[in-house]
Amino acid sequence: LLHTVRSSFKSSHLESAKHLTMSMLYFYARKLEHLEKDKKKREIVFDRFCDDVRKFYKINRSIPFYSGRLAVSSKYLNDIVKEKTGITANEYIDRQTIIECKALLSSTDMSILKISLMMHFPSYSVFGKFFKRMTGMTPTEYREKTK
């Protein structure tokens, strides 16, 4: 297209060159408009994901749950979260979860089993492994350290 525009200018087909230039401007304006709409959509999806995580992380931490609620693919959701935060959607949910777990362990006398059930972990063992992976210590060690 650029080659055709240059040729038109050189061969003094000024009217053709003007039309080609206008076509190029229109093309790039439409492309920019599309990119802006996509960016806005991605921001909306990310904001809704964050809201949903705050509402549901205690009962559901699976990416398909969130992508289904947002009517997007799990990959698309993960790409957006990674673009916005630098971490995966799973990591985002895990970080939200560990904040709550730490708060419950340090500010309540609830048993660790009760906390794991309240946070909807399938078992005490799964909760313990999750907590250790996220913090480097067991729930008991964390509680003792923060008391």
What are these regions (language model features)?
Residues 83-128, 144-147:
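Terminal helix-turn-helix DNA-binding modules in bacterial transcription factors
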Residues 65-72, 77, 81, 115-122, ...:
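Append "Primarily bacterial transcriptional regulators
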Residues 35-42, 63-65:
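Short acidic alpha-helical/loop segments enriched in Asp/Glu that coordinate divalent cations
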Residues 2-11, 25-35, 50-62, 80-85, ...:
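Basic, amphipathic alpha-helical hairpins
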Residues 7-19, 40:
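All-alpha amphipathic helical-bundle segments outside canonical DNA-binding/catalytic cores
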Residues 20, 41-49, 85, 93-97:
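N-terminal positioning helix adjacent to the helix-turn-helix/winged-helix DNA-binding module
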